[in-house]
Amino acid sequence: MKILAGPSSQLLASKVAKEIKCDLALVEFKKFPDGELYLRIADELDGEVLIIQSTVTNDDVISLLQLIDAASDCYVRIVVPYFGYARQDKQFKPGEPVSARVIAQSIDADEVFLINVHDTSTLDHFKLRTRRKAINLSAARIMGNHLRGMHFESPLVISPDEGAVQLVRDTAEAMKAEFDVLVKKRVSSEQVIIQPKNVAIDGKDVVIVDDMISTGGTMAGAIKLLRSQGAREVHVACIHPVLSQNARLLLYHSGVESIIATDTIERAESVISVAPLIKEGLQIR
């Protein structure tokens, strides 16, 4: 088997190659003046490939499809660490496409692995050659292990809403730390406050965990809130560091101590590699 690195996941693919002791094939990329993308697999393939490519941008989606086509004579295993368009997993308004389904059904492969996909219903949209189901891997444990090594003082792991509770619970378990969730509590007919559901935060180091940080607006509000309620330090951690627009500035302006993320999207904050997780996932047959 050879590993084909897409343009958005070159460093991660290199790490996976080392983890599984597999050759990394040379892939050439370029963009024409009119915006069209070109790629070429410059090495010979041996019948089985592992393509690793996050689909952060539209160009990334096209590059993934081009890689699949270029390797179509092989048994194709694909890892999409960050699966773009996953948030459009249903029709929210009449006339909208289910974009997650559109992208999933365009992927012609034998096996597909995603990492902490926005909604696991997306897995049902893949129509794989082998008739297998796409697999969703969770990076909660490796993120929790990394956070435990940061030696926080009285750590408390917080979910910014009910939607991230399972991820936060699993992360906290790996950290051997308490966890809680922010909830809205009505104190009068006109006033609603947001606070942790069960655990007092005064004097604790708080880590807010979510699957994704995009614009940073939700996280920024939570940081300010926890600071005002007596947290000693507030850190944020996520699987997918989209970090669009001025997200970093917004988070640091709100008082965050650090931004910690995995390399499903390769950013400066990507200090946790999912390469070992991918190695484990590939053993699932």
PLM region spans:
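PRPP-associated nucleotide enzymes
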Residues: 1-285
